[in-house]
């Protein structure tokens, strides 16, 4: 790797975050711990990572010309995408011109579109997945649902945090599911994926790091989803040695195919010793927030080390830990958090994200906890999150 310069000096090593949410905020903090100069970009002002960055910009990152102009002006050494709504074709062009995109522009483009990553996993790598079809019209959507059968799931090919996702149980659900998926889409893609139901015992996120010293795995993270978005996560998730080995093999094949240095959040379904591929993100994963207390190197620290070309070595896991989200339904531009003394019980921590607006349901923070067992840690995290009083 190249030497790291000093932030705000002529030879500074600059990192530009495309997306400045709570995950980007932690990447910014870890970057600054290594002396990097951080530039945060998002579509709204005062986003969480902007509050800790050296400087920030507000723009629509789907506008390729504007994105290119900003990057050429700031001249970052590393471009680090955190969200899906980005002009990925521009990133491909910039990378061909010599810019470094994390982990690489191809990985960002493929994974920000469910069609790209699903075809890579199922058709190129021949990994087990749920049955699926893609549709770009209501007629094609109806046909896809008929072929997959009920129950099935509809998702925009580009979305985040569960937006636009729904379950279909009968013909009455088809039209509303199509409309909901189209409304929840991000970026320029209009297609919808229809997925068949997968019966599983549990689902995991296997944080997988591709670095200068090889591929590394964090302990598997279990999580509970509701309405397509994570509500709590825990590490480690107990699973059989055979299932863990299969999960690691699948994750390794996916990240090798995507390429580049960085951390990948590989989502998998587990049924006994069987493992089925679900999705992958080429960046820190929201369920991985638990690693802020569960590991000596959080997923954010691992991501930064990896894309800088630094070795990872051994990742130490501290035992049963859990996270539970703070997810109020409010309308406010000036939220306050109360009862924190009660929330911060022994063996717990809080992260309040500092989001400047809430207009409905929005994740504003996370409670973190550890314990003698997974269930103890989960209960502590849930109790801590429930104790926080959030007022508009």
Curated annotation (Swiss-Prot):
Keywords: ATP-binding, Ligase, Magnesium, Metal-binding, Nucleotide-binding, Purine biosynthesis. This is Formate-dependent phosphoribosylglycinamide formyltransferase. Its EC number is 6.3.1.21. GO terms for molecular function: ATP binding; magnesium ion binding; phosphoribosylglycinamide formyltransferase 2 activity; phosphoribosylglycinamide formyltransferase activity. InterPro entries: ATP-grasp (IPR011761), ATP-grasp_carboxylate-amine (IPR003135), ATP_grasp_subdomain_1 (IPR013815), PreATP-grasp_dom_sf (IPR016185), PurT (IPR005862), PurT/PurK_preATP-grasp (IPR054350), PurT_C (IPR048740), Rudment_hybrid_motif (IPR011054). Pathway: Purine metabolism; IMP biosynthesis via de novo pathway; N(2)-formyl-N(1)-(5-phospho-D-ribosyl)glycinamide from N(1)-(5-phospho-D-ribosyl)glycinamide (formate route): step 1/1. One of its GO terms (cellular component) is cytosol. Mg(2+) binds at residues 267, 279. PANTHER family: FORMATE-DEPENDENT PHOSPHORIBOSYLGLYCINAMIDE FORMYLTRANSFERASE (PTHR43055:SF1). PROSITE patterns: ATP_GRASP (PS50975). Homodimer. Residues 119-308 form the ATP-grasp domain. Belongs to the PurK/PurT family. N(1)-(5-phospho-beta-D-ribosyl)glycinamide binds at residues 22-23, 82, 286, 355, 362-363. It comes from the Bacteria. GO terms for biological process: 'de novo' IMP biosynthetic process. Gene3D superfamilies: 3.40.50.20, ATP-grasp fold, A domain, ATP-grasp fold, B domain. The keyword Acetylation does not apply. It is an enzyme of class 6 (ligase). The keyword Metal-binding applies. Involved in the de novo purine biosynthesis. Catalyzes the transfer of formate to 5-phospho-ribosyl-glycinamide (GAR), producing 5-phospho-ribosyl-N-formylglycinamide (FGAR). Formate is provided by PurU via hydrolysis of 10-formyl-tetrahydrofolate. It catalyses: N(1)-(5-phospho-beta-D-ribosyl)glycinamide + formate + ATP = N(2)-formyl-N(1)-(5-phospho-beta-D-ribosyl)glycinamide + ADP + phosphate + H(+). ATP binds at residues 114, 155, 160-165, 195-198, 203.
């Amino acid at each position: 790797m190249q030497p790291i310069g000093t932030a705000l000096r002529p030879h500074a090593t600059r990192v530009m975050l495309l997306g400045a949410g709570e995950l980007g905020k932690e990447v910014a903090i870890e970057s600054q711990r290594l002396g990097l100069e951080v530039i945060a970009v998002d579509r709204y002002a005062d986003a969480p990572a902007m509050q800790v960055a050296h400087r920030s910009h507000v723009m629509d990152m789907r506008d390729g010309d504007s994105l290119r102009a900003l990057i050429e002006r700031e001249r970052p050494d590393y471009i680090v995408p955190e969200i899906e709504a980005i002009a990925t074709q521009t990133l491909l062009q910039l990378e061909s011109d010599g810019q470094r995109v994390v982990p690489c522009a191809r990985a960002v483009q493929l994974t920000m579109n469910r069609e790209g990553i699903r075809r890579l996993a199922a058709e190129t790598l021949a990994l087990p997945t749920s049955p699926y079809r893609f549709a770009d019209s209501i007629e094609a959507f109806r046909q896809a649902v008929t072929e997959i059968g009920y129950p099935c799931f509809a998702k925009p090919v580009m979305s985040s945090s569960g937006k636009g996702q729904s379950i279909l149980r009968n013909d009455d659900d088809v039209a509303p599911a199509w409309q909901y998926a189209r409304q929840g889409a991000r970026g320029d893609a209009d297609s919808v994926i229809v997925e068949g139901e997968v019966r599983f015992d549990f689902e995991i996120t296997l944080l997988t790091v591709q670095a200068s010293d090889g591929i590394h795995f964090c302990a598997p993270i279990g999580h509970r989803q509701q309405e397509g978005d994570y509500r709590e996560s825990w590490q480690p998730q107990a699973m059989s040695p055979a299932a863990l080995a299969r999960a690691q093999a699948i994750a390794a094949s996916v990240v090798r195919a995507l390429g580049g240095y960085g951390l990948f959040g590989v989502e998998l379904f587990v049924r006994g010793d069987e493992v089925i591929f679900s999705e992958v993100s080429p960046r820190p994963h929201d369920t991985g927030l638990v690693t802020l207390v569960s590991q000596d190197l959080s997923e954010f620290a691992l991501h930064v080390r990896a894309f800088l070309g630094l070795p990872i070595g051994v990742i130490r896991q501290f035992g049963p830990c859990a996270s539970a989200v703070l997810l109020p339904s409010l309308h406010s531009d000036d939220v306050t958090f109360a009862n924190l003394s009660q929330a911060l019980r022994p063996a717990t921590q809080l992260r309040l994200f500092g989001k400047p607006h809430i207009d409905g349901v929005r994740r504003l923070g996370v409670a973190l906890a550890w314990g003698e067992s997974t269930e103890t840690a989960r209960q502590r995290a849930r109790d801590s999150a429930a104790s926080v009083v959030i007022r508009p």
